[in-house]
Amino acid sequence: EDIMQDGLKGMLQSKIPLGYYICHLMEEYSCENLFFYLAVEQYEHHQFETRDDQHIAAKRIYSTYIAPNSQLEINLESKIHKAIVLALLDSDSLLHVFEPAKHHVFELLNLSYHRFISSPLWDTMIAQC
């Protein structure tokens, strides 16, 4: 019900329906977008004990999702990629370092979500949940 009202934001807060959405993203070969988005959400809400801990976490997100040829590389515009690289060099601006990329990826997820609600997998989810 929340998903019907809140769309993608509701889906991201769900449990079982989110599993169906992950299956859809896997079919589209784009589940790395969701994983990145969730990693950044966790990063932004985590209370780091030290600036170094925050920097290590930011570098981990970068090396997993943003670095060229990374395991789960997301598709970003070069200007967003460059801004992240520069921000990682300046440890004073780490809190919102991924914000432009997160916004971009959310838009990609939203496009996938609209394809999902038109798919047979959506109908299966509605029937089962």
Regions inferred by a protein language model and the residue ranges of each:
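Long, compositionally biased intrinsically disordered regulatory segments in eukaryotic proteins
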Residues: 1-129
